From Swiss-Prot:
SMART domains in the record: Ribosomal_S3Ae
Region: Disordered, residue numbers: 1-20
One BP term from GO: translation
UniProt entry keywords in alphabetical sequence: Acetylation, Cytoplasm, Ribonucleoprotein, Ribosomal protein
Subunit structure: Component of the small ribosomal subunit. Mature ribosomes consist of a small (40S) and a large (60S) subunit. The 40S subunit contains about 33 different proteins and 1 molecule of RNA (18S). The 60S subunit contains about 49 different proteins and 3 molecules of RNA (25S, 5.8S and 5S).
An MF annotation (GO) of this entry: structural constituent of ribosome
Record-stated family: Belongs to the eukaryotic ribosomal protein eS1 family.
Cellular location(s): Cytoplasm
Skewed-composition ranges (Basic residues): 1-18
Name the record gives this protein: Small ribosomal subunit protein eS1
InterPro entries, sorted: Ribosomal_eS1, Ribosomal_eS1_CS, Ribosomal_eS1_euk
Modified residues (N-acetylalanine): A2
Length: 256
């Protein structure tokens, strides 16, 4: 008889399953708050592993980026084709305070804009806001028919495209460099810059569907908690100085 392992004895009991622990029992739920520049502040909830040992839950949450539809933030379906990126910068209690991190168009919207018989013009510019955020703005525009035009096509000449692109970069540079990130966000929501470009280029070639299709955050300044709390409307300190009035008393020297 061969000496070896008895296969029957080594087998465990059938039907006994390994006890599994639900991973969600170790997690906490945090609320994600959008800046006060948007109408709807509550973005949603996010999960994170509970603080244990050297692993802090706050450190895991900081830097998280959420992509939210602008239609949800503004409670307006007309903005459904735009997506806003929000970055978690600070944790207060069970709330994640976020800041603007970028903007983008949905793919289906971009595909629907591109059509036959028209010229597509794109421009991008790198600009620094007054509060030292380095951004790259991408603009898109399409030519349209002039009033009483009979010809089917609306192709612009290369010289006209260059002139339009120059105007686009100038307007984007001017509008973004003269304001803070929060003020720029206010301009991006109602598409103020797109309308400015459309108005300025009317004499070169009439345009339609002019949009800032993408905003990319390249570099952020050193984190400022006070500025973030002001952005969320949660600042309790009064930054304004108060005038100090003191009665002037002339000093008399007793001995010279």
């Amino acid at each position: 008889m061969a000496v070896g392992k008895n296969k029957r004895l080594s087998k465990g009991k059938k039907g006994v399953k390994k006890r599994t622990v639900d991973p969600f029992t170790r997690k906490d739920e945090y609320s994600v708050k959008a800046p006060s520049t948007f109408q709807i502040r509550d973005v949603g909830k996010t999960l994170v592993n509970r603080t244990s040992g050297l692993k802090n839950a706050n450190d895991s949450l900081k830097g998280r980026i959420f992509e939210v539809s602008l239609a949800d933030l503004q409670n307006d379906e007309d903005h459904a084709f735009r997506k806003v990126k929000l970055r978690v910068d600070e944790i207060q209690g069970k709330n994640c305070l976020t800041n603007f991190h970028g903007l983008d168009f949905t793919t289906d919207k971009l595909r629907s804009l591109v059509r036959k018989w028209q010229s597509l013009i794109e421009a991008n510019v790198t600009v620094k806001t007054t509060d030292d955020y380095l951004l790259r703005l991408f603009a898109i525009a399409f030519t349209k028919r002039r009033p009483n035009q009979i010809k089917k096509t609306t192709y612009a000449r290369s010289s006209q495209i260059r002139a339009i692109r120059k105007k686009m970069t100038e307007i984007m540079q001017r509008e973004a460099a003269s304001c803070s990130l929060a003020q720029l966000t206010h301009k991006l929501i109602p598409e103020v810059i797109g309308r400015e470009i459309e108005k300025a280029t009317q004499g070169i070639y009439p345009l339609q569907n002019v949009h800032i299709r993408k905003v990319k955050l390249l570099k952020a300044p050193k984190f400022d908690l006070g500025a973030l709390l002001n952005l969320h409307g949660e600042s309790t300190t009064d930054d304004k100085g108060q005038k100090v009035e003191r009665e002037f008393k002339e000093q008399v020297l007793e001995s010279v």
